[in-house]
Regions:
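Short beta->alpha connector loops at strand-helix junctions that form conserved
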Residues: 44, 461-463, 482-485, 573, ...
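Nucleotide/phosphate-binding sheet-loop regions of phosphoryl- and nucleotidyl-transfer enzymes
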Residues: 1-403, 410, 429, 435-438, ...
């Protein structure tokens, strides 16, 4: 008989931490903690295979599942001494999701399941605390109705708020047993009104309703969005964990909390977290109440007057500190823990590798290696390359004036400025218009995830460091300030009030997620300083990677940034980007308007010294590192004005005839410029353009070599080659110019001539082309366009639908399509190296900074990747991980 249920508890478990794919992260963690003898409430896991079966069979379950669940539930009752549905000593359970990848808050949870009108009386009698029993029952009705019955929780919040207002109460803890009992009746009536049916009283019906709801939540919109943002496959499914309830809401000797074994924002090695006395777990993570600090040191640092867990519950605190040491040593990583204290007894509800900022990830990885818990190679694999992006963006200038409006909790580091928006939909809409926004909410919920993704930063008035906003923002690398209680939001009026000032949607704010400050208006930012653990981990990564990492740089500023980030050369210098300066664009336009070759050469002569200076600066900055310069690539019409007014203005500035300029612009118009008169085709028809650029390169190389005494070996790249004959023709012009400059300067010139492989024909004919080309650089942007027959500039209108419908697993312009484009690259490398065995091969499209694409480049045997300057550290780390066999496989 197939096994559909895995039990844990009482010092043993049927699963292990290695069974994460089957049991999900939560189930595997609970099983492992139980096996380690840690205090875990007994329970069982329904594995991800059941979720897969559920969706493949019209929301039906395997035939044996109900019998196995009943048996496992009976075993939980045996261990606890309780019975499910019993009216004397009832067993209550929680039902939680648990995917193999952490998806905080994205799926559904139900607590206190098993309560009904009879068992609530039994719970009251057994506990001797009627208030606790009815508080638990009203929580269950709220969660079950929201998750299973589709009755939104705001209905119950309104009933509660009205009752508190009428009774003169401020806090939930002010309510008495009689209050909760009355509210339970009102809640049940609301369910009857909304659904037309009474609230379910049969515990087994409740259980299967909750199990079905958790499986269904795998396909809710917020979970789908989260999976898309974090590249989590839909096919993985979720497990369901059913576990005996332990209660943190049994008075002042009970509590619930979340802790990390190291600080998830900074990586500092000390217990970090929050707890709430007389509460249940959802109160902490939902951010509805602002929690208390766990340690005395943290309480003093925060300036809180509320007691810490260390002071209020010293025995439970001591046990927690012991357990966190056990778990970190066992898992050899920072752990995120959930716990409940029931009448001074600590229970562990979850352990998992904790989400952390890039800054924390670097520090934790390096310190774990230095402590001997992991190797340096393991440390290199512990940091997500894409997360380094968090470290490479502006922070607030220390010299900037800070007009502090309020201070909350520093929930996710970094700083951001933007216009205030009060809803996730507004944030997404304004982002689409190119505007930067700060999402301001009382608290965020999983429904806000699309707006959080669109926002530059997040600001909440409630919630702590482990609230939904904090956890999700850290995972996204977004600055976040939470729990800024001095702020007052009026959603209906669209205003934010603080210290007597009223701000409207569209006003500018700055949030500093490193200090918790909310600042007035726009504030100056500075670039980050990278050192310490960053430098250490990067040096370890450089020690294991095989691929070189170059940069795409067109200006001295780009080149300097790239060198600072560890670039080993320039893999793509786009010479056309040097032509758009006001002085230069006029000379380019004169060249385009010229009636004959002589006039064109006269215009190009004006550009020669400018290009020579550009190249000389790059050669000097790169200090002997390779520099690959692409000859002019875009079609000429891109340099001409558009529209009558612009044409008249440009003609006046040039002293040219507006009609001639307009006629020339019309004459250069193309129906499909991506496949038109561009690239090497310009050099074939107008060889004088390539000659001018080659002369500028060689004169600059000779000048820098003479002044510095260091060899300069430029790599000249001819774009959009489809045939060897094209390359032969252009290379002959380049070689002739090299000989001329060599004769004029009397010095030696060493250079390489290669080509971009960006057309399928070029990849297929790579063996022949390599007879002339001394290196290949795969231009994966255009190769993707020409392989798919998709214009990158026009793809946004439909590519989203393709990824949503799983026609393409990822956007092929973001992550390389291995099966199609990747196969052409493999063919090109193999055939090229058959002709020229030491052929140097790289890529220089946007994919050069994508970790999954870099993993492919490692597998395909390329020599280097080239990416934008700010992605160089990402590429260095991704290349190291690829060499260690941990690259991200991604397919389209």
């Amino acid at each position: 008989m197939a096994k559909w249920v895995y039990s844990f508890g009482d010092g043993k478990a049927e699963g292990t931490s290695d069974m994460r794919n089957l049991l999900g992260g939560k189930g595997a963690g609970l099983a492992e903690m139980a096996s380690l003898g840690l205090p875990v409430p007994p329970g069982f896991t329904i594995p991800t295979e059941v979720c897969t079966y559920y969706y493949a069979n019209g929301n039906a379950y395997p035939a044996e599942l109900k019998e196995q669940v009943a048996a496992a539930l009976g075993e939980v009752g045996r261990v606890t001494g309780k019975a499910f549905g019993d009216t004397q000593n009832p067993l209550l359970v929680s039902v939680r999701s648990g995917a193999r990848a952490s998806m905080p808050g994205m799926m559904d949870t139900v607590l206190n399941l098993g309560l009904n009108d009879a068992t609530v009386e039994a719970l009251a009698n057994k506990s001797g605390d009627r208030r606790f029993a009815f508080d638990s029952y009203r929580r269950f009705i709220t969660m079950y109705s929201d998750v299973v019955l589709g009755v939104d929780h705001h209905h119950f919040e309104e009933i509660l708020d009205e009752h508190k207002d009428r009774s003169g109460y401020t806090l939930d803890t002010d309510l008495t047993a009689a209050d909760w009992e009355k509210l339970v009746g009102l809640y049940k009536q609301k369910v009857q009104d909304e659904t037309g049916k009474p609230f379910p009283q049969d515990p087994n019906d409740q259980l299967w309703g909750a199990i079905g709801a958790v499986f269904s939540s795998w396909m809710n919109q917020r979970a789908i969005t989260y999976r898309r943002l974090h590249a989590i496959p839909e096919s993985w499914g979720t497990a369901v964990n059913v576990q005996a309830m332990v209660f943190g809401n049994m008075g002042d000797t009970s509590a619930t909390g979340v802790a990390f074994t190291r600080n998830p924002s900074t990586g500092e090695k000390k217990l970090y977290g929050e707890f709430l006395i007389n509460a249940q777990g959802e109160d902490v993570v939902a951010g509805i109440r602002t929690p208390q600090e766990i340690s005395e040191a943290a309480r003093k640092e925060a300036g809180s007057k509320k007691p810490s867990m260390e002071a209020a519950l010293p025995d439970a605190y001591a046990e927690l500190t012991r357990i966190y040491g056990v778990l970190e040593k066992h898992y050899r990583d920072m752990q995120d823990l959930e716990f409940t204290v029931e009448q001074n007894r600590l229970w562990m509800l979850q352990t998992r590798s904790g989400k952390r900022t890039a800054k924390a990830a670097l520090r934790i990885a390096v310190e774990l290696a230095n402590e001997g818990l992991i190797t340096r190679e393991e440390a290199v694999t512990r940091v997500d390359p894409a997360a380094l992006d968090q470290l490479l963006h502006p922070t607030i200038d220390p010299k900037a004036e800070r007009k502090v409006l309020a201070t909350g909790l520093p929930a996710s580091p970094g700083a951001a400025t933007g216009e205030i928006v009060f809803s996730a939909d507004e944030a997404e809409a304004m982002k689409a218009q190119g505007r930067k926004v700060i999402l301001v909410r009382a608290e965020t919920s999983p429904e806000d995830i699309h707006g959080m993704h669109a926002a530059e930063g997040i600001l909440t008035t409630r919630g702590g460091m482990t609230s939904h906003a904090a956890v999700v923002a850290r995972g996204m690398g977004k600055p976040c300030v939470s729990g800024a209680g001095a702020l007052r939001i009026d959603y209906a009026a669209g205003t934010l009030t603080v210290a007597g000032q009223v701000f409207k949607a569209g006003d500018f704010l700055t949030v500093d997620g490193s200090t918790g400050q909310v600042l007035l208006g726009k504030v100056n930012m500075i670039e980050p300083e990278l050192s310490g653990e960053f430098g250490t981990l990067m040096s370890w990564a450089d020690g294991v990677r095989r691929l070189d990492v170059r940069t795409n740089a067109d200006t001295p500023a780009d080149a300097r940034v790239a060198i600072k980030f560890g670039a080993e050369g320039i893999g793509l210098c786009r010479t056309e980007h040097m032509f758009f300066d006001d002085e230069r664009i006029q000379a380019v336009r004169e060249m385009i308007l010229a009636d004959d070759e002589a006039a064109r050469r006269a215009a190009l002569a004006k550009l020669l010294p400018m290009q020579r200076q550009d190249f000389a600066e790059l050669f000097e900055i790169m200090d002997g590192r390779p520099v690959t310069i692409r000859l002019l690539d875009p079609p000429l019409h891109e340099f001409l004005p558009h529209g009558d007014k612009e044409i008249e203005d440009v003609a006046a500035a040039m002293g040219a005839d507006p009609k001639k300029l307009a006629d020339r612009a019309r004459g250069l118009h193309e129906f499909n410029p991506m496949l038109g008169f561009r690239g090497c085709r310009l050099a074939v028809v107008y060889p004088e353009i390539a000659e001018m650029q080659a002369r500028a390169i060689f004169e600059a190389a000779a000048d820098v070599a003479k002044r510095t005494g260091k060899a300069v070996v430029p790599e000249i790249m001819v774009p959009l080659i489809a045939t060897r004959a094209e390359l032969d023709l252009v290379k002959a012009r380049i070689d002739a110019m090299a000989q001329a400059v060599k004769t004029e300067t009397g010095g030696a010139l060493t250079y390489l001539v290669g080509t971009m492989i960006e057309l399928p024909r070029a990849a297929l004919m790579a063996g022949e082309i390599a007879g002339t080309a001394e290196f290949f650089s795969f231009g994966t942007n255009d190769l993707t366009q020409t392989t798919f027959g998709i214009s990158r500039d026009d793809a946004a209108s439909f590519l989203g639908a393709y990824t949503e419908r799983n026609i393409l697993k990822v956007d092929p312009f973001v992550s390389l399509d291995r099966e199609g484009v990747g196969e052409l690259i493999r063919i090109g490398v193999e055939r090229g190296r058959k002709t020229r065995d030491k052929l140097k091969v790289g890529i220089c499209g946007e994919h050069g900074g994508d970790p999954a694409s870099i993993a492919f480049c490692e597998e395909a045997g390329l020599d280097y990747v080239s990416c934008s300057p700010f992605r160089v550290p990402i590429a260095r780390l991704a290349a190291a991980q690829a060499a260690l066999g941990k690259g991200s496989a991604s397919t389209a």
